[in-house]
Amino acid sequence: MPRSFGQSSRVPRVLVVTNMYPDDQNPDFGTFVQEQVEGLRARGLPVDVIVVGGKRDKWSYIDGARRFWRQIRQQEYDVIHAHYVFSGVVARLQRGVPLVVSFHGAAEMVGWVGWLCRLLAPWADEVTVTSAVHKRELGRQDAHIVPCGVDLRLFVPMLRDEARRRLGWPDDRRRVLFVGIPRPEKRLDLIQAAVARLQHTEPGVELVIATGQAHHRIPLFMNACDVLVLASDQEGSPVVIKEAMACNLPIVSVDVGDVAQVIGSTEGCFVCKRDSEDMAKKLGLALAFGHRTQGRQVIERLALEKTVDAVLEIYESIWQKP
């Protein structure tokens, strides 16, 4: 198991470059990157973060590149870790510090962005991907499969009635939960159509859209709802599925990314077709299941601590090279 660095005479320093990171305006944007950073810091590693691009216009990458160069001139680093391809391009503008690039899934592998990913991958010292399929698509055979982990200390089961009381919700509805930013590729339209179809036979069902919520509040929503739904066109290894599993929340999802592998044969969790009729049918089955799942037992292998272990092993392999 990788060591912590608190007792080291010289502690290696890491710079994380990312286009996704939570802020006051977008508290749920890139929380999995923040969790990994905090996990590394908890092991004793000094980690600085540069946010480039993100939700701002594309020209903001130029400003981000300037801030990146200013930072590496002011501070010496032992490794630079970039999340997503555009951050990786910015980080590879320098050649003096080893670079790890984490590619985060199928959405990056489409069209010209996918071409850019495959172009960048050989220029990184180490690469992480979310799944074996993602590794094959990227075309780098020595890529490390490191799916984002779930914080099992934050995402814990609690009584549904207590969660609803804390949210001020009445207890006369069954609730379908969507978590995330409703961008077109998240297919909220499909979810809404499926819930509307289900309401013809189950009028007490409603859709809850949890957008713009602070990350620490998401477990409350998951424990207060009856089923999580995911309908994205593209995902790599969606953290929200693992978070729902950690809360023992039933799940209905399209077959995207590694969802089918993560939920496995967990009772109360269903993979549906990408149409409103089958999604409504599977939502009905999840609601009829009537209680919480055993998802937490299944997901323990994907705990955040294990992801941090894997990242540290990659860093150490770089630092041990002559």
Which ranges hold each PLM region?
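Aromatic "clamp/platform" in nucleotide-sugar-dependent glycosyltransferases that forms part
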Residues: D233
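Carbohydrate-associated surface elements
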Residues: V133, G149
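Short alpha-helical donor nucleotide-sugar binding micro-motif in glycosyltransferases
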Residues: A121, L220-C225
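Conserved donor-binding/catalytic core segment of Leloir-type glycosyltransferases
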Residues: L15, Q141, P170-K186, Q192-V195
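Short His-centered aromatic/hydrophobic patch
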Residues: A82-S87, F103
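Conserved acidic donor-binding segment of nucleotide-sugar-dependent glycosyltransferases
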Residues: S265-E277, G284-F289
